[in-house]
Amino acid sequence: MDIIGGQHLRQMWDDLADVYGHKTALICESSGGVVNRYSYLELNQEINRTANLFYTLGIRKGDKVALHLDNCPEFIFCWFGLAKIGAIMVPINARLLREESAWILQNSQACLLVTSAQFYPMYQQIQQEDATQLRHICLTDVALPADDGVSSFTQLKNQQPATLCYAPPLSTDDTAEILFTSGTTSRPKGVVITHYNLRFAGYYSAWQCALRDDDVYLTVMPAFHIDCQCTAAMAAFSAGATFVLVEKYSARAFWGQVQKYRATITECIPMMIRTLMVQPPSANDRQHRLREVMFYLNLSEQEKDAFCERFGVRLLTSYGMTETIVGIIGDRPGDKRRWPSIGRAGFCYEAEIRDDHNRPLPAGEIGEICIKGVPGKTIFKEYFLNPKATAKVLEADGWLHTGDTGYCDEEGFFYFVDRRCNMIKRGGENVSCVELENIIATHPKIQDIVVVGIKDSIRDEAIKAFVVLNEGETLSEEEFFRFCEQNMAKFKVPSYLEIRKDLPRNCSGKIIRKNLK
């Protein structure tokens, strides 16, 4: 089923400007409280100016341009400005340090970088010491260093006409971006995403939360992440809705922002939901217009129920990954929830559970979650310049191996168990980290939790729990282990406990387990 009709991203923005004109398309709020608003017409003009800027700097169809930016209007301008001229965006996690950023520059073949002054010294060093194809840097800040090969993004953009000067032939099969995975267990891989992928993501995600043109979709997710781009931004723009991009997440400020912009849809990761729940209760907890909150793994049933009850919203499960572009398994609009199920496969997808020999398993049996889509259309096209890694996860007929374990019931509802790499082998038993984390998270003193396996000469692996406590709380080992013994099988009880101030996380809020082993 082709729901795109051959329309690439350039055509999308020209149509949106014509249809929605002066309706608000984008609102960006900086950490300092500065707010920028753009109508669909104004945003399309800014995108055109940005496309013209890149053209004047020698960027042509197929060239790669890296973005190392926090959430800001310039990210949106660049994303779609590059797409309009057939160039390819390479977003870089704004939290990455020198070595990781240099690695992505080298492996993406990016020849131009857009960043801010705070990151410039790092890239200046990379240019001097690393072999990259980077030949020019645009800074979004006003102040400029007196260096060759550096220019002001804003000054150059504002000098450009609001109509597009360079419009090469485009196809929905053309690559729009290369998004490098977070790489919690290995070097990140470049996920190739096409114009079709992004257009499909917009329509699919809008369907997922029944989005309309009078909706306001607010997100604090980082713009360089697939969730912000495909679940939020593309959904909002495809529906003609208003997209609100907040620079940084703050649990104290979040509900005020939701109320201020009259948001009707938002998205959350577990860390956000947990930190929102530990904020002091307020009479304004339900004084908002939110009807749906898209959320991503993992939350316990108790956490979900408590959040919905306190804030009066519906949580919509969305299971996916960078390679699937969108949440390919989730709660459908109007469906009743069947927690702890993660939902059913969405339209245009098939899903099944397979064993270690790649054979489908019957209902109730645990195996690998596999998804069937169309490469370059409903799932990613390939890993950039890495056919071996592509072949390892993507079959020729479109079946994608997620690396996650789960099972399915008789009615087609799927249940997530864990990442295969997060299964602990303890004395012949397989123990799911997620299962233990969901149990331990119910302890009233615990704010955040991660469980990992560590080497054990007798039982293969021992279980260690890292916890972050709620503010002002103390927790003894005796109390912790007693709680575990009362709530889980003996062989699942952790052997070790470490209390920390925080846990290491990547850009999407996922805990980096390798840093704890």
Swiss-Prot record:
Any one of the GO BP annotations: fatty acid metabolic process
EC numbers: 6.2.1.48
Keyword tags: Ligase
Catalytic activity: 4-(trimethylamino)butanoate + ATP + CoA = 4-(trimethylamino)butanoyl-CoA + AMP + diphosphate; crotonobetaine + ATP + CoA = crotonobetainyl-CoA + AMP + diphosphate; (R)-carnitine + ATP + CoA = (R)-carnitinyl-CoA + AMP + diphosphate
Pathway: Amine and polyamine metabolism; carnitine metabolism
PANTHER family cross-referenced by the UniProt entry: ACYL-COA SYNTHETASE, MEDIUM-CHAIN ACYL-COA LIGASE ACSF2, MITOCHONDRIAL
Function description: Catalyzes the transfer of CoA to carnitine, generating the initial carnitinyl-CoA needed for the CaiB reaction cycle. Also has activity toward crotonobetaine and gamma-butyrobetaine.
Protein name listed in UniProt: Crotonobetaine/carnitine--CoA ligase
Native organism: Escherichia coli O9:H4 (strain HS)
Gene (UniProt): caiC
